[in-house]
Amino acid sequence: MKKSISVFGTILFLLLIVSTASARKFSIGAFAGLNLPLVQQDAKSGALFGAKGRIPLLPFLALEPNFVFAKYAGKDVGVREKTYPQEGGDITSFGADLLVGSMSGMSKVKFYGLTGINFNTYKRKGFSNETGLGWTLGTGFEFLPTEILGLEIRARYHAIKVGEGGKAYLEVSGGLNYYFGSE
C-alpha cells in the first residue's frame, strides 16, 4: 500500500510538471562571447560560441541543455631566461544548466541565476586529449523586445576537473533566443 501511494504521488508530480511545462514557451538559442582563463598560466582568453534550448519546468525554474565550443589562445612561457610559445587549446562542452528566476510572465526583462553540470573535452596540440566533468555557476538577464525574440547576456564561472588538477574560466556571452509555444 505504501509503495502504491509513493508511485501514485511520483506519477502525479511528474504529470503536474509536464502539464505545467507544456503550457509555457520553450526556446532555442545561440550565443557567442569570451572565455577568460582564471587559473591557467599557459592560456590567454579566447572566443566561445554555442547553442541551447530552454525548457520551463515551473514559472521560476527552467532546464537548459547546451553545447559550447571554446577556443583559447596560446601564451609564451618563460623557462630559465628563455621564452617558449605555447599553443592554444579547444574545449568542447555538453551539459545542462538549471535556471532559477523570472522564467515566465509578461515582464520584458528576465533576471536569473544558474547552476549546471557538463562533460568536457580539452584538446591541445602536442598533448593527449583530456576529459572531465565540470560545473557552472552564474547569472544572466534577458530582454524581450517581442514575444518571440529574446536578447540575452550572461556570465558563468566554469570549473572543470581534469586528472589531478582542474581548469577554471569565466565565460561572458551574449545571444538570441527564439520562443515558441504559448504562455
Residues covered by each model-derived region:
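Cleavable N-terminal export/targeting peptides
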Residues: 1-25, 181-183
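Short glycine-rich, acidic/polar surface loops and turns
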Residues: 137-142
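N-terminal targeting signals for Sec/Tat export/insertion, comprising classic cleavable signal peptides
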Residues: 32-60
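Transmembrane beta-strand segments of Gram-negative outer membrane beta-barrel proteins
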Residues: 23-34, 111-113
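Transmembrane beta-barrel outer-membrane domains
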Residues: 23, 40-46, 85-93, 128-134, ...
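Short, solvent-exposed loop/turn segments at secondary-structure junctions
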Residues: 38, 121-124, 159-161
